């Protein structure tokens, strides 16, 4: 199991919270103290809670569920997109469209439109249009790609969300709650931890902190997917062996 160490958390600055005047009292159990007007997060609790979140995400992937990585603030965009892609999962790192989960059927129509536009440009169908029309189609494609590119292959709502900065992603979290989708989130000292199923207390502003925690969650997905593949392979081998024995008995 690829866990996270206290050293890694310290080096990435995961322990630095927000200014003491900008805090949510509900985060008090996760705060170690304050230094120079900044809250310091209790990393011992972060390590313990991270393990719980890691195990949950790994189990989701092992059972074949998809994880949607969400982080639209500038500091999170690259890590969310790159790490979700690395573990073959989906992501939203630009703008959360209202109804992305609760009205997924309508969102899927836009995804299908994006796929059709991609196909038109890939197979040359777009050449049948005028230059002006082709330019309009390309603008439409780029706009859809920006907001929906990370969920292009997502055929149904995800099994869980991994979120950076729940305060910034309230719409996504509210939609997940309505549908009973569990939420794993990196929760800073200014956030409300109550709606989060798996709280990871930590700095949600520093790029290094975001990258570290997001990459570890991607590792959890990969570990779960690998275990799932091994299970499926074992099952196939057992079925093949059983069929072989059956044929021998019949002979």
Curated annotation (Swiss-Prot):
Alphabetical GO CC annotations of the entry are: cytosolic small ribosomal subunit
The encoding gene: rpsB
GO BP term, pick one: translation
Instruction: Name the family.
Output: Belongs to the universal ribosomal protein uS2 family.
- What's in the keyword line of the UniProt record? Ribonucleoprotein, Ribosomal protein
Q: Which organism is it from?
A: Geobacter metallireducens (strain ATCC 53774 / DSM 7210 / GS-15)
Which CDD domains does the UniProt entry name for this protein?
RPS2
This chain belongs to which protein, by name? Small ribosomal subunit protein uS2
Do you know which InterPro entries this protein is assigned to? Answer: Ribosomal_uS2, Ribosomal_uS2_bac/mit/plastid, Ribosomal_uS2_CS, Ribosomal_uS2_flav_dom_sf
């Amino acid at each position: 199991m690829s866990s996270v160490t206290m050293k890694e958390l310290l080096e990435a600055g995961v322990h630095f919270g927000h200014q003491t005047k900008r805090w949510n009292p509900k985060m008090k159990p996760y705060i170690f103290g304050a230094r120079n007007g900044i809250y310091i997060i209790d990393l011992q609790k972060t390590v313990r809670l991270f393990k719980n979140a890691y195990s949950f995400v790994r189990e989701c992937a092992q059972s074949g569920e998809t994880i949607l990585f969400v982080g639209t603030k500038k500091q999170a965009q690259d890590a969310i997109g790159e790490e979700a892609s690395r573990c073959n999962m989906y992501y939203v790192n630009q703008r959360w469209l209202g109804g992305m989960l609760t009205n997924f059927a309508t969102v899927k129509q836009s995804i299908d439109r994006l796929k059709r536009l991609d196909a038109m440009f890939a197979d040359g169908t777009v050449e049948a249009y005028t230059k002006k029309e082709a330019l309009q189609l390309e603008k439409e494609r780029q706009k859809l790609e920006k907001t929906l590119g990370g969920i292009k292959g997502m055929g149904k709502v995800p099994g869980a969300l991994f979120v950076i900065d729940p305060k910034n992603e309230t719409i996504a979290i509210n939609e997940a709650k309505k549908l009973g989708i569990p939420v794993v989130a990196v929760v800073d000292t200014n956030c409300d931890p109550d709606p989060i199923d798996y709280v990871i207390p930590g700095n949600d502003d520093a790029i290094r902190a975001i990258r570290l925690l997001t990459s570890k969650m991607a590792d959890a997905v990969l570990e779960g997917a690998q275990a799932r593949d091994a299970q499926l392979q074992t099952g196939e081998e057992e079925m093949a062996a059983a069929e072989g024995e059956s044929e021998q008995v019949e002979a």
